[in-house]
Amino acid sequence: MPKDVVDPPYPGSTATAREVLDLAKVYQATALTLFDASTGRGMEAARPAHLCALQAIELALNAWRRHMGEPFGTIRSRGHDLSCPIPAAALGLRHATTAHLVALTGRREYLRVRYDPTLSEGWSHRTRITATMNEVVSKVSLRFNPTCVAPARTAAPPTARRPTG
């Protein structure tokens, strides 16, 4: 490429945290629809739903990281690592969900579901991946909703009165 030509920005690098979260919700809805459509048709039929669920999880965690001010380049350098403990702790994820995020990364599940045509086992059951996806997207969404933040107290709470008599 000639020196005077500037590379276009990496796709998504200019997206806001809210836009990334909105995209995660699109993938979440699609995953749920595809899981419903694949019921009773075996694991292979659920592969697209599984991939959408993994993408929804990753996007929601990335939205949280963007919301917290993490630079896009740092987020991108993580690849598909969902196991970072900081968002899990900050979001108040359940232990089972946090352990599942670590397992997803350890098994390289995103890459296996996406690229391995022979994959027939060793990936998360649909109820586990759906529970993880729903919890992550839900808890990230709660952190974006300003009505969920408790207002600061400006005065001391009233003291309790003792009953007389």
Regions from the language model: what does each represent?
Residues 19, 26, 44, 48-51:
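An amphipathic alpha-helix/helix-turn recognition signal
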Residues 32-47:
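Helix-loop segments that flank and shape redox-cofactor active sites
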Residues 1-28, 32, 69-165:
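Long, charged low-complexity segments
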